[in-house]
Amino acid sequence: MRLAGILLHVTSLPSPYGIGDLGKEAYRFLDFLKECGFSLWQVLPLNPTSLEAGNSPYSSNSLFAGNYVLIDPEELLEEDLIKERDLKRFPLGEALYEVVYEYKKELLEKAFKNFRRFELLEDFLKEHSYWLRDYALYMAIKEEEGKEWYEWDEELKRREKEALKRVLNKLKGRFYFHVFVQFVFFKQWEKLRRYARERGISIVGDLPMYPSYSSADVWTNPELFKLDGDLKPLFVAGVPPDFFSKTGQLWGNPVYNWEEHEKEGFRWWIRRVHHNLKLFDFLRLDHFRGFEAYWEVPYGEETAVNGRWVKAPGKTLFKKLLSYFPKNPFIAEDLGFITDEVRYLRETFKIPGSRVIEFAFYDKESEHLPHNVEENNVYYTSTHDLPPIRGWFENLGEESRKRLFEYLGREIKEEKVNEELIRLVLISRAKFAIIQMQDLLNLGNEARMNYPGRPFGNWRWRIKEDYTQKKEFIKKLLGIYGREV
């Protein structure tokens, strides 16, 4: 069955509380998807973000925790955990991270003081014990110390049992505050996901390849990463120099110690996927090529130039994962430098690959051209890392424009390019056709979500337009091209 969906991160939804959240507007958006005939909603990672990491959902202090800025304040009010006077409304514009981190934390502190059902927290802690105990303790110590885990005293840094016991007793209140925050987030998300299911909408989640060095994941499982005796990274992740960057990209995350992952039967990965399948129906695997071979750069290098390719045990990993999750919920983000080995890995396990129509018109044989897109692909109009179609077209070279017009059989005006490319994506054989919301709204570079390589100023775009006006237009197209549900 050929399906269609919208790519829109939760932070981009309208909301009076400074950032898109899990409140009324998220439910309204799901109603819109249902009324149009869509069956998929793709989001970016829901993990915690921070100002220090440029608010990137791909740079988090936990690959398991939820981002408290997405919590809906009105639900806290409905549960009598805060008062009406505690609600602050902000003008609808870009995501106000600087304000929202403080504001939502204050609200949650008040809500925690008024919370009485501690048996619910204990049940939640038990259910999520494989990550939450360590995460809540990590957050409590980090608050107390005011620095990252690798700067803590040796006994805490190295997780010595007695030291952890002592600090847990000392910081019990803060520990339970962070358990409470996660309890609220997961409760609100589960409620929203149930609503989506009732409307026949599946949610596509997104799994970043690596956690940050300054994360609970690395502190809790140092043996699963390539660290030295002082727990400093031996190598960090990135991508080599290419056409777009002479020095490559240096991400700075510690790389996996795959030998240890294999030794423990990939237990950490199984838990991670299992955890995320409680939240999502499908999982996009960011930087899929890293499962076949990854670029590692010696720690301390200023660019990615002096890195090297190292083989990863992708075949063994996916064999194991698919024995646990036979429905194969994965989508490979296989864009960029892709070798035959990466293709072979994806095809061996029948994992759908990603194609983007914006890449289609740079050469005649492109695998991104609609007639070359295969059934086992997810076809995008654009992605969070790319300009929306209108912005892309504005900067498109003469040769590529010519190819586009030849492909369409006529020249078209700038304001119509988004419609034409949406049609081409929908008409393809791809099992999933995903339209980025900015393309449905015909927005340009002002609405771009992320500029890779630019550390700050990203992830701020929010919907200001009345998107429901697009309902009849898109409903008709989904019907014409056999993707309406």
From Swiss-Prot:
GO terms for cellular component: cytoplasm. Its main location: cytoplasm. It catalyses: Transfers a segment of a (1->4)-alpha-D-glucan to a new position in an acceptor, which may be glucose or a (1->4)-alpha-D-glucan. Its EC number is 2.4.1.25. SUPFAM superfamilies: (Trans)glycosidases. One of its GO terms (molecular function) is 4-alpha-glucanotransferase activity. GO terms for biological process: carbohydrate metabolic process. It is found in: Cytoplasm. Keywords: Carbohydrate metabolism, Cytoplasm, Glycosyltransferase, Transferase. It is an enzyme of class 2 (transferase). Belongs to the disproportionating enzyme family. PANTHER family: 4-ALPHA-GLUCANOTRANSFERASE DPE1, CHLOROPLASTIC/AMYLOPLASTIC (PTHR32438), 4-ALPHA-GLUCANOTRANSFERASE DPE1, CHLOROPLASTIC_AMYLOPLASTIC (PTHR32438:SF5). This is 4-alpha-glucanotransferase. It comes from Aquifex aeolicus (strain VF5).
